[in-house]
From Swiss-Prot:
Protein name: Riboflavin biosynthesis protein RibBA
Catalytic reaction list: D-ribulose 5-phosphate = (2S)-2-hydroxy-3-oxobutyl phosphate + formate + H(+); GTP + 4 H2O = 2,5-diamino-6-hydroxy-4-(5-phosphoribosylamino)-pyrimidine + formate + 2 phosphate + 3 H(+)
Domain of life: Bacteria
Organism whose genome encodes this protein: Bacillus cereus (strain G9842)
Alphabetized HAMAP family for the sequence: RibA, RibB, RibBA
Family named by the database record: In the N-terminal section; belongs to the DHBP synthase family. In the C-terminal section; belongs to the GTP cyclohydrolase II family.
């Protein structure tokens, strides 16, 4: 149904149009997208004839500043905060509305010699400012267009047009599939574009390294930041992990209540301590401490989930009642940190098969699963049983 991102990039580089779909829980629509650098009157005419939506030009903040393109409104109340600037026509155009003149305006917008005074305002081309970070920060068509342009090595600007059915309704995925077939156009999703970027781009930065003496032994601690969010992660390294043999690794998600306060609701604290002790005994290994509190939902939402558990919901049902998946964690950032440490082959301390699949999806080889089972407590027996029954954890209870 959907094409690979690589296929879409090849078509875009040839000046072709692609269809990009967003999430069904967001706008749930598809846009025609082309590279602004290769725009032609024929492409504009195709978009307005078969797309029927508004032709917009996603650009970076740099373009907007250079051409003095102010926001369309001072107070943006759009539900998705689409960053429209004032609309423009190039001064060489007449009405500015024809396919030829709209293409001219777009071409001149990209001209490095153009100045703000070279454009009349308002006009018939609608620039949109993409957020820095692209779809990794905002999963919109604006950011998708600029990201695709960058991935093609083109000027960071696109041309987009919403796809509307002949009866005036918004085209949804079944309609978009037929459209793609009719015009032999590649169709991709923003979700796949996000995954592609996460897989192919380096998103972590090694910030600081120290020696950390602990109750379990002395470790080499390395602090990491990442470009996706403000979360900071830490890797505790023991011994020489540069040797080619598989390395014992624990990827541990932060649990303030368990790790720090010794909560009996979970087994996180004992798992953390046992992993550190086991790595120390082996004399070589890595404990990666990820700031993914509450399986990714955050501390306050975890406490809200606990409240629901007190009312009879299990850990999975509580997450879902709060509007979250059972497990919101993504292992891409953790995988990049492990790769930065030079690891390729792992002996993974885990009871969670999803964690194995998550890391292997980023080209890390898990050669062995090393169980990390703690004695159950009266207060967490039900929690652990739910992890077995609903999350597939490998525990002997």
């Amino acid at each position: 149904m959907f094409h690979r991102i690589e296929e879409a990039l090849e078509d875009l580089k040839q000046g072709k149009v692609v269809i990009v779909c967003d999430d069904e829980n967001r706008e749930n629509e598809g846009d025609f997208i082309a590279l602004a650098e290769y725009i032609t009157p024929e492409t504009i005419n195709f978009m307005i004839t078969h797309g029927r939506g508004l032709v917009c030009v996603p650009i970076t903040e740099g373009y907007a500043e250079r051409l003095q393109l102010e926001p369309m409104v001072s107070h943006n109340t759009d539900s998705h905060h689409t960053a429209f600037t004032v609309s423009i026509d190039h001064v060489s155009t007449t009405t500015g509305i024809s396919a030829h003149e709209r293409a001219t305006t777009i071409q001149e917008l990209l001209n490095p010699a153009s100045k703000g005074t070279d454009f009349n305002r308002p006009g018939h081309i609608f620039p949109l400012i993409a957020k820095e970070g692209g779809v990794l920060r905002r999963a919109g068509h604006t950011e998708a267009a600029v990201d695709l342009a960058k991935l093609c090595g083109a000027e960071p600007a696109g041309v987009i047009c919403e796809i509307i059915n002949e009866d005036g309704t918004m085209a949804r995925v079944p309609d978009l599939i037929e459209c793609a077939k009719q015009f032999d156009i590649k169709m991709i999703t923003i979700e796949d574009l996000i995954a592609y970027r996460r897989h192919h781009e380096t998103l972590v930065t090694r910030e600081v390294e120290i020696t950390l003496p602990t109750d379990f032994g002395t470790f080499h601690a390395i602090g990491y930041s990442n470009s996706l969010d403000t979360k900071e992660h830490i890797a505790l390294v023991k011994g020489d992990i540069s040797i080619g043999e598989p390395v014992l690794v624990r990827v541990h998600s932060e649990c303030l209540t368990g790790d720090v306060f010794g909560s009996h609701r979970c087994d996180c604290g004992p798992q953390l301590h046992a992993a550190l002790a086991q790595i120390e005994r082996e004399g070589k290994g890595v404990l990666l401490y990820m700031r993914q509190e509450g399986r990714g939902i955050g501390l306050l939402n975890k406490l809200r989930a606990y409240k629901l558990q007190e009312e009879g919901f299990d850990t999975v049902e509580a997450n879902e009642k709060l509007g979250f998946p059972a497990d919101l964690r993504d292992y891409g950032i953790g995988a990049q940190i492990l790769k930065d440490l030079g690891l390729q082959s792992l002996r993974l301390l885990t009871n969670n098969p999803r964690k194995i699949a998550g890391l292997q999806g980023y080209d890390l080889e898990v050669v062995e699963r090393v169980p990390l089972q703690m004695p159950a407590k009266e207060e967490n027996k039900s929690y652990l049983q739910t992890k077995v029954n609903k999350l597939g954890h490998l525990l002997n209870l």
